[in-house]
Amino acid sequence: MARLLLRRGFFSSHIRMSSDQLGELGTGAGKGGGGGGSVRAAGGSFGRREAAEEERYFRQKEREQLAALKNHHEEEIDHHKKEIERLQREIDRHKGKIRKLKHDD
């Protein structure tokens, strides 16, 4: 039990320490936005602008991917509905054959 409490304390302090090192994106090297290129590493308004552009780009890519995924699922649904209709016709055809066999008896 003591080990569990010690671990919890370690993780919470580790999270606090790492969150203190994060800064605003694009504010320079060593902060949350550093290392993304020379403009972002320099910090300042150009770094923040570059970080904002990058975030906007990735949000747009995510929206495009979600739209493509939604379209794919809609196509899959349409395909399966058509397959259900085809199989239902097959079932009806076989039921008709069974009725015909019963009628012939």
Swiss-Prot record:
Its main location: mitochondrion. SUPFAM superfamilies: F1 ATPase inhibitor, IF1, C-terminal domain. GO terms for molecular function: ATPase binding; ATPase inhibitor activity; protein homodimerization activity. Residues 73-105 are annotated as: Antiparallel alpha-helical coiled coil region. GO terms for cellular component: cytoplasm; mitochondrion. GO terms for biological process: erythrocyte differentiation; heme biosynthetic process; negative regulation of mitochondrial ATP synthesis coupled proton transport; optokinetic behavior; protein homotetramerization; regulation of neuroinflammatory response; visual perception. Residues 58-105 form a coiled coil. Gene3D superfamilies: Single helix bin. It comes from the Eukaryota. Residues 17-52 are annotated as: Disordered. Keywords: Coiled coil, Mitochondrion, Transit peptide. Disruption phenotype: Defects in circulating erythroid cells. Embryos are anemic despite normal expression of the erythroid cell markers. The erythrocytes from embryos that survive to adult stage exhibit hypochromic, microcytic anemia. Histological analysis of adult haematopoietic tissues does not show morphological defects. Defects are due to changes in the mitochondrial pH-and consequently the redox potential-to change to a level that reduces [2Fe-2S] cluster-containing fech activity, thereby reducing heme synthesis, resulting in hypochromic anemia. Residues 25-38 have a biased composition (Gly residues). Residues 22-51 are annotated as: N-terminal inhibitory region. It is found in: Mitochondrion. Belongs to the ATPase inhibitor family. Homodimer; represents the active form and is present at a pH value below 6.5. Homotetramer; represents the inactive form and is present at a pH value above 7.0. Endogenous F(1)F(o)-ATPase inhibitor limiting ATP depletion when the mitochondrial membrane potential falls below a threshold and the F(1)F(o)-ATP synthase starts hydrolyzing ATP to pump protons out of the mitochondrial matrix. Required to avoid the consumption of cellular ATP when the F(1)F(o)-ATP synthase enzyme acts as an ATP hydrolase. Indirectly acts as a regulator of heme synthesis in erythroid tissues: regulates heme synthesis by modulating the mitochondrial pH and redox potential, allowing fech to efficiently catalyze the incorporation of iron into protoporphyrin IX to produce heme. Forms an alpha-helical dimer with monomers associated via an antiparallel alpha-helical coiled coil composed of residues 73-105, leaving each N-terminal inhibitory region (residues 22-51) accessible for interaction with an F1 catalytic domain. The inhibitory N-terminal region (residues 22-51) binds the alpha(ADP-bound)-beta(ADP-bound) (ATP5F1A-ATP5F1B) interface of F1-ATPase, and also contact the central gamma subunit (ATP5F1C). This is ATPase inhibitor A, mitochondrial. It comes from Danio rerio.
